[in-house]
C-alpha cells in the first residue's frame, strides 16, 4: 500500500518539526496531535489536520490515528529527565488506536542507549531510557509492522540524505542530524525492509 496519510506524534519537538516540514513537502497529508498548537510553525509547511490533546488520552490518540495509512512517533520529554511514562503510555494508546482503525505501519524513535550495555547508560538519563525500553516492548509485542529507530546524538547539521543505516546494532558514527533523522523516518514509510528491526542511522558530518 502506498502511504499518503500519516499521523505524527511529537511534531513540536526538534526532530518533529523538521519531520513535519519534510513530510508536507514530500506530499504527505499529515495529522498531528499537539498539546500546544502555538508551538507549530507559523510559516512554511503546515499539517493538514491538527488535533489538540494529549498522547496519554486514548480518545485524543484515536481521533489522530483514524483514517491514516501509517504513524510516526517522535515522542520525547524535552529537557525533563525525571521519571516518566509518557512515551510508553503514548505507545500503548497509539498501538490500540492503530489496531482499532486497521493501521499497521508505525515508525517510532527511541534512543541508541537501548543498544548499549545497560550499565553504561549515564545515570541522569536512566529514567528516560527506562521508559524508552517500555515503549520499545509495547511495539515489539504489538503484532504491527514496526520500525524501531534508535539514533545516537541528534545534531543540527544540514540535511544530507547520505547517512548510514545499521540494522540491529551500532554504526560508524555517534551522531545524526535531526534533518537526516526525519528524512530516515519518512523513508521507512516507503519500504518494508526495516520492519521488525532496530535501526541506527548515523553519519560522519564535515
Curated annotation (Swiss-Prot):
- Expression across tissues: At least expressed in the liver and erythrocyte.
The answer to keyword Phosphoprotein applying to this record is yes
Q: Where is the active site?
A: 109 (s-nitroso-cysteine intermediate), 188 (s-nitroso-cysteine intermediate)
- InterPro entries for the chain: NAD(P)-bd_dom (IPR016040), NAD(P)-bd_dom_sf (IPR036291), Polyketide_Oxido-like (IPR051606)
What Gene3D superfamilies does its record include?
Answer: NAD(P)-binding Rossmann-like Domain
Q: Which family does it belong to?
A: Belongs to the BLVRB family.
Check the record and name the PANTHER family matching this protein: FLAVIN REDUCTASE (NADPH) (PTHR43355:SF2)
Under the subunit heading, UniProt states: Monomer.
In UniProt terms, what function does this protein have? Enzyme that can both act as a NAD(P)H-dependent reductase and a S-nitroso-CoA-dependent nitrosyltransferase. Promotes fetal heme degradation during development. Also expressed in adult tissues, where it acts as a regulator of hematopoiesis, intermediary metabolism (glutaminolysis, glycolysis, TCA cycle and pentose phosphate pathway) and insulin signaling. Has a broad specificity oxidoreductase activity by catalyzing the NAD(P)H-dependent reduction of a variety of flavins, such as riboflavin, FAD or FMN, biliverdins, methemoglobin and PQQ (pyrroloquinoline quinone).
Its name, as the record gives it, is Flavin reductase (NADPH)
Species, as recorded? Bos taurus
Instruction: Give the classification, highest ranks.
Output: Eukaryota, Metazoa, Chordata, Craniata, Vertebrata
Q: Which gene encodes it?
A: BLVRB
Amino acid at each position: 500500500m502506498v502511504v499518503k496519510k500519516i499521523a505524527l506524534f511529537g511534531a513540536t519537538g526538534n526532530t518533529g518539526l523538521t519531520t513535519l516540514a519534510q513530510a508536507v513537502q514530500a506530499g504527505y497529508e499529515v495529522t498531528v496531535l499537539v498539546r500546544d498548537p502555538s508551538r507549530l510553525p507559523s510559516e512554511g509547511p503546515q499539517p493538514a489536520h491538527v488535533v489538540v490533546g494529549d498522547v496519554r488520552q486514548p480518545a485524543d490518540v484515536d481521533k489522530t490515528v483514524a483514517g491514516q495509512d501509517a504513524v510516526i512517533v517522535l515522542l520525547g520529554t524535552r529537557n525533563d529527565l525525571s521519571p516518566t511514562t509518557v512515551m510508553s503510555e503514548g505507545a500503548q494508546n497509539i498501538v490500540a488506536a492503530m489496531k482499532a482503525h486497521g493501521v499497521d505501519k508505525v515508525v517510532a524513535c527511541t534512543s541508541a542507549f537501548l543498544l548499549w550495555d545497560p550499565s553504561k547508560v549515564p545515570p541522569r538519563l536512566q529514567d528516560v531510557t527506562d521508559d524508552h525500553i517500555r515503549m520499545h516492548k509495547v511495539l515489539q509485542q504489538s503484532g504491527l509492522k514496526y520500525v524501531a529507530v534508535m539514533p545516537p546524538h541528534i545534531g543540527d547539521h544540514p540535511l544530507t540524505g547520505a547517512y548510514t543505516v545499521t540494522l540491529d546494532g551500532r554504526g560508524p558514527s555517534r551522531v545524526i542530524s535531526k534533518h537526516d533523522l526525519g528524512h530516515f523516518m519518512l523513508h521507512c514509510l516507503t519500504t518494508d525492509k526495516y520492519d521488525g528491526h532496530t535501526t541506527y542511522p548515523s553519519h560522519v558530518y564535515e
